[in-house]
Swiss-Prot record:
Alphabetical list of PANTHER family matching this protein: ELONGATION FACTOR P, ELONGATION FACTOR P (EF-P) FAMILY PROTEIN
Species name: Rhodococcus erythropolis (strain PR4 / NBRC 100887)
Name of the protein in its database record: Elongation factor P
InterPro entries listed in its UniProt record: Elong-fact-P_C (IPR015365), NA-bd_OB-fold (IPR012340), Rib_uL2_dom2 (IPR014722), Transl_elong_fac_P/YeiP (IPR020599), Transl_elong_KOW-like (IPR013185), Transl_elong_P/YeiP_cen (IPR001059), Transl_elong_P/YeiP_CS (IPR013852), Transl_elongation_fac_P (IPR011768)
A Gene Ontology molecular function term of the record: translation elongation factor activity
Signal sequence coordinates: none
Family statement: Belongs to the elongation factor P family.
Length: 187
């Protein structure tokens, strides 16, 4: 159990049998009336985001979420296979649990797997990943009608928009949360 004064970003709450993580929160003390805490919660399993208000001082059930460092090994049908670096146990995680993170998942990549009661909840990649451009059309100088970007296919199969000067074979730094191009990697 945690009080509203214990709220922090990333805390996982158990509300009505479902797991919710706090994205952001704000303590509000109006001039008239009792204080309250306004939160933005994200459902751990479905990804749904909702706004919820708690009265100040209310106790809320918290969930124990273990985050383990694991290594992604390979994709097997509809499952992704990860290995725990400490115990060398292999864990099979479904495509639905991995979600969009699979777009930037490379073999032997270090990731964090969050579990609750030994059930995998989600996979967290590093914030930035370095990937090689598998294919992109050559950029033409003066072609600025699209804002100076063009589509590029990465080695994982993900497609992102990159500046016109990027060529096939370049190594890029990509934000794994939203798929934005961050820069070239000097090798």
């Amino acid at each position: 159990m945690a009080s509203t004064s214990d709220f922090k970003n990333g805390l996982v709450l158990q509300i009505e049998g479902q797991l919710w993580t706090i994205i952001e929160f704000q303590h509000v003390k109006p001039g008239k009336g009792p204080a309250f805490v306004r939160t933005k919660l994200k459902n751990v399993l479905s990804g749904k985001v909702v706004d919820k208000t708690f009265n100040a001082g209310v106790k809320v059930e918290t969930a124990t979420v273990d985050r383990r460092d694991m290594t992604y090994l390979y994709h097997d049908g509809s499952d992704y296979i990860f290995m725990d670096g400490d115990t060398y146990d292999q864990v099979s995680i479904s495509e639905s649990t991995v979600g969009d993170q699979s777009r930037f998942l490379l073999e032997n990549m270090a990731v964090q797997v969050a579990t609750h009661e030994d059930v995998p909840l989600f996979v967290e990649l590093p914030v930035t990943v370095e990937l090689v451009v598998k294919h992109t059309d050559p950029g033409l100088q003066g072609d600025r009608s699209t804002g100076g970007t063009k589509p590029a296919t990465l080695e994982t199969g993900a497609e992102i928009n990159v500046p016109l000067f990027i060529n096939t074979g370049d190594k890029l730094k990509v934000d794994s949360r939203d798929g934005n191009y961050l820069g070239r990697v000097n090798s």
